[in-house]
A protein has these predicted regions:
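N-terminal secretory signal peptides
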Residues: 1-9
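N-terminal alpha/beta PP-like core and its mobile active-site loop of ThDP/TPP-dependent enzymes
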Residues: 7, 16, 20-401, 510-512, ...
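Acidic/charged coordination and interface sites in well-structured regions
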Residues: 13
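Phosphate/pyrophosphate-binding active-site segments
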Residues: 40-64, 206, 230-231, 243, ...
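Active-site diphosphate/adenylate-binding microenvironment
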Residues: 70-73, 78, 96-101, 417-505
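Conserved hydrophobic/aromatic pocket- or pore-lining residues that grip, position, or stack substrates
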Residues: 85, 279, 305, 449, ...
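Thiamine diphosphate
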Residues: 173-183, 330, 390-391, 470-629
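Conserved short loop/turn motifs at secondary-structure junctions
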Residues: 282-286, 433-434, 518-520
């Protein structure tokens, strides 16, 4: 064995020096006596990383706390039934972290390690759309809040309840070094306040308990949106006061706001009298009950339904579904009823047609961020949660139907069934174009995927806008969990985190979660693959790898032609080539089963079949498919 060179430190010499140094600290006169009897707020624990943050030699403090405030915070969190805590670890909530995993046993909530706050928040977004309730997202001060902000905005636009807990060091006198100052704020929730429903900064543990329960109730009352509570580090780390009698508030869900009875009766009259009513559903079905109630209303009236699919509102193979011919349905309509439609202005109707909106969005709105769309002209506006109002509307409709109207409805339903089938056949014909093309057409990819999952209890946990909505056109969807809609705010980076979060929610139900993943979107948040592998979250990811930000390719092409310059250089700044990204290897590097890239459509079915078997064993898998642009 070679001897250490002069000036180098041998292993034994290093260990002797380290041991001697430790002994000197422990045996120093007065070391224990100098320890404070009562820990200051935000007492600094002896962590080695502190040296890197402050540039000073770390000190060892002999301070213990039998019951920190964060233990009580965990009691509050558990009382609300949070299953998961999505987070990237950080010191502004180190006490809450420790209390969750030790005092709370890392159960309900279980700590899910995320590589970025945008991933954590996106996972909570997807989880809530399956489970129907929030997960907890804990983020680190100023920087964590800003990292999470895009995903918070997506959830806000999508009307999804996400519960954020923000760490902070409010007391400036107790901040330890330059990093603590940079990561603290007077008002740490300020960056996201324009796109959350409510927030608070509690000053005591009782205040924390009441505001946390209040925030949960507000988030879960339609229109549902994200909320935030600041959990100050001092409040977490300071011991519970001697003899403290803290009260645990009782959470009682608020009944969703229902429509005024007179307005509901008027809408029922309009629906029964209309010749060609169209029911337009957008974010209607918050739960499986919403889908069932819309089916009952449509069947009762034999009315056309257009599902805008930001939730799974209506079965795709139901004969009254006219989603594949929405423009024609609108053109024929003498009454259009929008049920939680975000952009009712964009639903075109013929002159003289009656228009009715029913949405909880009329009960709450922000002003700075313009997600509320253009102001629509309507003849009747019902400010209410549509899902909660549908039962009374159905009963009001049934009371008004005469035998003559029932016969008319049956005839109308037969005609709609034919147009539905004709539209479905047209979609199948369109899907056959470029069937054997390489790269693979998005229609062929969707069809091959459907062939491998249709006999399973499956759940499509991704947006499908950028694959031309082929799954919505071709697949038989009739359960609420079959599709979770899009991102809401169209922020790039939503797809993979939301899919992983939704897959985690689906896991306990034994469902096969399927993610059709855009390539550029994945590159914002590849660390979500590691989270899926680390926590054994079964998710099948099929890459839509067109090696470009193709939406922007088209935008640049449009501008180039508009400016009279030709579109040949539109690939500059928009392509993901040279080098091409190998997503299978990327997945493998994160511990995920990866196959591909696949460019021959004949190889796609077998590759998906192998990946499905991996997912059914409880692990994530990814198949990289080279695809046509759309």
């Amino acid at each position: 064995m070679a001897k250490p060179s002069a000036g180098s430190v041998g292993r034994r010499d290093f260990l002797k020096t380290a041991a001697a140094g430790t002994a000197a600290v422990v045996s120093a006169p007065g070391a224990v006596d100098a320890a404070p009897q009562q820990p200051p707020r935000n007492a600094t624990a002896p962590v080695v990383s502190r040296d890197a943050e402050t540039g000073r030699t770390p000190t060892i403090e002999a301070v213990t706390t039998d019951r920190p405030g964060s233990d009580f915070m965990v009691d509050v969190i558990k009382a609300l039934g949070f299953e998961y805590l999505f987070s990237n670890p950080a010191n502004t909530f180190r006490s809450l972290h420790e209390s969750c995993i030790n005092y709370g046993g890392n159960r309900a909530p279980e700590f899910i390690t995320c590589c970025h706050e945008e991933i954590a928040t996106g996972m909570a977004h997807g989880y809530a759309k399956i489970e129907g309730k929030p997960a907890l997202v804990v983020v680190h001060g100023t920087v964590g809040t800003q990292h999470a902000s895009m995903a918070v905005y997506d959830a806000f636009c999508d009307r999804v309840p996400v519960f954020l807990m923000l760490g902070n060091h409010l007391d400036a006198a107790e901040r330890t070094g330059v990093v603590a100052w940079a990561h603290s704020a007077q008002d740490v929730a300020a960056p996201i306040r324009d796109y959350i429903k409510w927030d608070d900064t509690p000053a005591s543990l009782q205040h924390f308990a009441e505001s946390t329960v209040r925030a949960y109730k507000i988030a879960m009352t339609p229109p549902m949106m994200p909320v935030a509570i600041v959990a100050d580090a001092g409040l977490q780390e300071h011991p519970l006061p001697e003899g403290a009698r803290l009260r645990m508030p009782k959470y009682t869900p608020a009944a969703p706001p229902q429509g005024d009875s007179g307005a509901v009766a008027e809408l029922a009259r309009l629906l029964v009298a209309a010749e060609n009513p169209v029911l337009v559903a957008d974010r209607l079905a918050r739960t499986p009950a919403g889908l069932a109630r819309l089916v009952e209303l449509a069947d009762t009236l034999q009315a056309a339904v257009v599902d805008q699919k930001r939730r799974m509102n209506f079965p795709t193979r139901h004969p009254l579904d006219q989603s594949n011919r929405s423009a024609a349905a609108y053109a024929d309509a003498d009454l259009i009823v929008g049920l939680e439609v975000g952009d009712f202005f964009g639903v075109r109707s013929k002159p003289g047609a009656k228009r009715v909106s029913m949405t909880a969005n009329d009960l709450f709105s922000r002003s700075n961020y313009q997600e509320f769309q253009r102001f629509p002209d309507v003849d009747l506006a019902i400010a209410a949660d549509a899902e909660a109002t549908l039962p009374s509307l159905v009963e009001a409709v049934k009371r008004l139907i005469t035998d003559d109207r029932r016969r008319f409805f049956q005839d109308r339903g037969s005609k709609l069934a034919k147009t539905h089938q004709d539209a479905l056949e047209a979609m199948r014909t369109a899907a056959s174009y470029a069937w054997d093309a390489s790269p693979v057409s998005t229609a062929r990819m969707s069809a091959e995927l459907w062939g491998q999952i249709k006999s399973e209890d499956w759940s499509l946990v991704s947006d499908v806008i950028f694959v031309s909505w082929w799954p919505l056109r071709l697949w038989a969807m009739d359960k609420h969990h079959h599709y979770i809609g899009d991102s809401g705010g169209y922020g790039v980076g939503y797809g993979l985190p939301a899919a992983v979060g939704a897959a985690l929610a689906n896991k306990k139900y034994g469902r096969l979660s399927v993610n059709i993943q855009n390539d550029g979107d994945l590159m914002f948040v590849p660390g979500a693959l590691w989270t899926a592998a680390h926590h054994h979250i079964p998710l099948l990811t099929i890459m839509h790898n067109n090696r470009a930000y193709h939406q922007e390719v088209m935008e640049v092409q449009k501008m180039a032609l508009q400016h009279g310059r030709g579109a040949t250089r539109a690939s500059i700044g928009t392509k993901l080539e040279d080098p091409p990204i190998d997503y299978a290897k990327l997945a493998q590097s994160m511990g995920v089963h990866g196959e591909g890239p696949i460019s021959d459509p004949r190889d796609l079915g077998p590759a998906i079949r192998r990946a499905v078997e991996v997912v059914k064993r409880g692990e994530p898998a990814l198949v990289d498919v080279l695809t046509q642009p759309r």
